[in-house]
């Protein structure tokens, strides 16, 4: 092999788009995939070209030595030889123009930005590419996401905010066509952990496990079935009737005044006592509503998959507190003792808790949930708004107090006859009303200096409130659009995964068809480890018939859909190093948060955790410098 020249041109064919650059350019970012590719000598078993048709190079005179089995290194990584082309993630060939051409089956548009990062040292995020795709490409090329320029960081981070919002508004997603799978996934989504054991050996236990998720979804998820929609409409009806009854109880037309005066013998005076009672019709209506709420509450707590979480839920606490006073009031109404009357008076005051039932509508209306999440996500903006208002109120209340004292009479030192602003705390109320542009008119300045302060206060209030409000509105728009998109998300189905080619097939391991041999991401040929590839296909398709391999548990078969779920379910993922140099791999395989494993068939080598065998035809490459890019290891997309 000849000495590598830094000014030698290299042609990178990425997804059919050819990019031409120098080896010195690729070496500007040590530790990345392209830097390792540029630092190594051309392997001997790569394909050469004759015209436009790729042909295998002549076989070596002696068979290459077999490399020992790969052993897991730190963090679950595999270290071993990296002499052949496929282990480097690309397919190389001699180009007639004199340069080396390497083929990578990756996204060509994103690679243009990656290559510009090598040229200019600045990594920008394309605006027309989805964030997870760009993140996946950065992970493949071994580039740290923190290298993204500040001008593009917000654009790059938008997909994670969207994923978090989609997690909040998660709706039922059915991933298969089998009704049994639908029930299992629904049970898993509703909190039933043992979704795979719905039909246990005990008949009674099996019936309970089948009934529990259905009843829970019936009262908790209005979109699970038609019966659930009917229950939701009934609950909505009783909530509105209960709130209407609560409001009508305060109207004079539904109040009955009764004389409760008790005659006293030998008394010198008579004290009249009157008591207001509610119309019995409203009491009966409220009783019917309470019976429904009691039935709903008991059913939900009995069939709840997690009793502790159910009890700690704020809406459930409100529901219980709104139900309990009615039964206590009915039980104590027949008692005439003073203690019972005091308790009844307290319970009548607690009746206002019934108005909080309006928050139960958040279960049935997406808009109310959007509003709640918007308020929660805009906490910083609300805090900033309160600070601005507090500063303005303090400043203008002080200014109006001293401005209105101008022109006070000498015989009126407190200026109580001259102005309504007798002290600064009273000015707080005026400043709040003025800054919020309400203007009740109960207090107003009367001097020219006070009018000037009032005008400045109104202008400052308009500017102060106008600054944080657009951020809150944008949050609401983002949450609402994502919630609507989540609801309209089509029914998911299992992806079609073609079967593995047989050894007798004419297309088995042909280089012209770009099979697993000499592919971009594959480290082994189908003929070398067909059993491993068959197992990987069965893992991706959810098939349990993988020979001697143990079946996967139901949580492992559930699709990875969200960034938070991917972080929780990550268990020592593997990555494959390109050289035998001392390289540090993170425990999570170097895959960053929010990065989902690729579903490509060319990326599944080693998914089962079996030992891979690489057969280099050249001596392993020894890097001149230690490759320790701990923040950005070079993972295979696994």
Curated annotation (Swiss-Prot):
Q: Could you tell me the superkingdom of the organism this chain comes from?
A: Eukaryota
Q: What is the effect of changing residue 167 to Y?
A: In DEE103; affects voltage-gated potassium channel activity; when expressed in Xenopus laevis oocytes, it causes a shift in voltage dependence of steady-state activation to more hyperpolarized potentials and results in a significant reduction of potassium currents
Positions with a binding annotation for K(+): 437-440
Instruction: Output the GO biological process annotations, alphabetical, semicolon-separated.
Output: action potential; cellular response to ammonium ion; cellular response to nitric oxide; cellular response to toxic substance; globus pallidus development; membrane hyperpolarization; nitric oxide-cGMP-mediated signaling; optic nerve development
Ranges of Pro residues compositional bias? 56-72
Listed result of changing residue 135 to G = In DEE103; affects voltage-gated potassium channel activity; when expressed in Xenopus laevis oocytes, it results in a shift in voltage dependence of activation to more hyperpolarized potentials and a slower deactivation time
Phosphoserine modified-residue sites: 600
Segments of this protein annotated with the region Selectivity filter: 437-442
Compartment(s): Cell membrane; Membrane; Perikaryon; Cell projection, Axon
Membrane-protein topology: Multi-pass membrane protein
Q: Which SMART domains match?
A: BTB
Q: Name one GO molecular function term.
A: metal ion binding
Assigned keywords, A-Z? Cell membrane, Cell projection, Chromosomal rearrangement, Disease variant, Epilepsy, Glycoprotein, Intellectual disability, Ion channel, Ion transport, Membrane, Metal-binding, Phosphoprotein, Postsynaptic cell membrane, Potassium, Potassium channel, Potassium transport, Synapse, Synaptosome, Transmembrane, Transmembrane helix, Transport, Voltage-gated channel, Zinc
- Looking at the record, which segments are called Disordered? 38-93, 538-572
The membrane-spanning stretches of this chain are 230-250, 284-303, 314-334, 346-368, 382-402, 453-473
Concerning PTM, the database record says: Phosphorylated by PKA in cortical synaptosomes. cAMP-dependent phosphorylation inhibits channel activity. Histamine H2 receptor- and PKA-induced phosphorylation extends action potential spike duration, reduces action potential spike amplitude, sustains maximum firing frequency in hippocampal interneurons; also reduces the incidence of high-frequency oscillations in hippocampal CA3 pyramidal cell layers.
Zinc is among the record's keywords: yes
Which of this chain's residues carry glycans?
Answer: 259, 266
Gene3D superfamilies annotated for this entry?
Answer: 1.10.287.70, Potassium Channel Kv1.1, Chain A, Voltage-gated potassium channels. Chain C
SUPFAM superfamilies found in the cross-reference section: POZ domain, Voltage-gated potassium channels
Any one of the GO CC terms: dendrite
Q: According to the UniProt record, what happens if one changes residue 125 to W?
A: In DEE103; affects voltage-gated potassium channel activity; when expressed in Xenopus laevis oocytes, it results in a shift in voltage dependence of activation to more hyperpolarized potentials and a slower deactivation time
Q: Domain comment text?
A: The transmembrane segment S4 functions as a voltage-sensor and is characterized by a series of positively charged amino acids at every third position. Channel opening and closing is effected by a conformation change that affects the position and orientation of the voltage-sensor paddle formed by S3 and S4 within the membrane. A transmembrane electric field that is positive inside would push the positively charged S4 segment outwards, thereby opening the pore, while a field that is negative inside would pull the S4 segment inwards and close the pore.
What this protein is reported to do is described as: Voltage-gated potassium channel that mediates transmembrane potassium transport in excitable membranes, primarily in the brain. Contributes to the regulation of the fast action potential repolarization and in sustained high-frequency firing in neurons of the central nervous system. Homotetramer channels mediate delayed-rectifier voltage-dependent potassium currents that activate rapidly at high-threshold voltages and inactivate slowly. Forms tetrameric channels through which potassium ions pass in accordance with their electrochemical gradient.
Subunit structure of this chain's protein: Homotetramer and heterotetramer with other channel-forming alpha subunits, such as KCNC1. Interacts with KCNC1. Homotetramer or heterotetramer channel activity is regulated by association with modulating ancillary subunits such as KCNE1, KCNE2 and KCNE3, creating a functionally diverse range of channel complexes. Interacts with KCNE1, KCNE2 and KCNE3.
The entry's protein name is: Voltage-gated potassium channel KCNC2
Provenance organism: Homo sapiens
Q: Give the organism's phylogenetic lineage.
A: Eukaryota, Metazoa, Chordata, Craniata, Vertebrata
